[in-house]
Amino acid sequence: MEMAVLHLSMLLRSKLVDRGGENLGRVEDVIVRLSDGAYPPVTGLKAHVAGRDLFVAAKMIAVLEPGRVQLAGDQLNFGRFERRRSEVLLRQDVLGHRLINVAGARLARASDIELAFNEGAWRVVGVDVSLRGPLRRRLPRQLGGRSAARTLLDWESVEPFVGHVPSSRLRMRFGKLSQLHPAQIADLVEAATHDEGEEIIRAVGADRELEADVFEELDLEHQVEFLHQRSDAEAANVLAKMGADDAADLLAELEQERREPVLSLLPKTQQRKVRTLLGFNPSTAGGLMNPDFLCLSERMAVKRALEEVKRSALEPEQLTVVFTHDSKKILSGALAIAALVCADPEARLADIVQRRPVSLHPDADLPEVARELTDFNLTALPVVDEEEHVIGVIAVDDVLELIFPEDWRRRFSAFSNE
């Protein structure tokens, strides 16, 4: 049996009639409860009757069709309509507003909303994000349903913004956003308005690690914008989960009077790393490096080295290369993780590493850093002190972000009407 489907645009301003067909008023909005499952059920209608806005419960509706809503009985509750907690009005709160197309990792605007009768109730099942939705709302009802093809998104693949909805218990849900890569979420934040971006950040805050990853992916302007509104303790919580190099860059952009209070709230180890990085010019090797890296004794066996890699707390992107040092802790070699995995487990690192790897001192400028990375086709470049001890590593992606145009990785807008 084919599922009954309606579009919100075809219901708005429809006649509201009693069981006998007598006109009572008109439909002003459709009310749903977002918290109830993947496809939220219609809980009722907002109707305009005799100069008043009334609530019509879903259980009172016998017929719901384009242009006409018929009640199961003759009586209405003539109490004024009042929004209840967790309720959303589809016309007022969703239609014409932006939402997140999670499947496409971009913003879109709701041009129309599709309802279907399923499991004993009318439910929101889809959103039309095409530019033709507004046109359909302006056409006569009999023509609107036959307008050009729609771009319909499954409701389960979208997340509406609800920060503007006057209800104290409504929040954007974290579950759908957690499906996205931090860089995709950052793209959404940067394409959104400030309030929309703040709503995304608040939702992502349910996972502190993900929140920090998203902050790392934001451009500096947006990082400062959203950190500025947080207390010192809240700012420190975000910075504590970020890489020390990213945390130092962001901390340097905070107001002078906030830097030390926020820095003092960081865990001691992170605090020490950040203080060290802040002592370097941000456009030099010292300012670009990440103080978290893996440098092992060249006398170590491959089998033991692999165990160290597994135990390492470094992020996967920081573990592309393992460096080695001699008995005096002087940099002696470099080896790609892929080569380490394929090596004889009993071999010593000294026998398989690339000897005398390229390195730079902290005062090397950005052009020199970029030149060494490109000339030697490196993904990671060690930074050494005067004694040739490794003090940090520069990743190629950190340099790319500086030498390419600001929006180089955002070739496609995160906002689209599909």
Locate the predicted segments by residue.
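Generic start-of-chain signal for non-secretory N-termini
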Residues: 1-11
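Hydrophobic packing positions in regular secondary-structure scaffolds
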Residues: 18, 57-58, 63-73, 77-96, ...
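Short amphipathic alpha-helical segments
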Residues: 24-25, 186
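Short, surface-exposed loop/turn motifs at beta-strand boundaries within globular domains
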Residues: 9, 23, 38-40, 181-182
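Basic, polyanion-binding surface patches
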Residues: 2-3, 19-22, 28-67, 120, ...
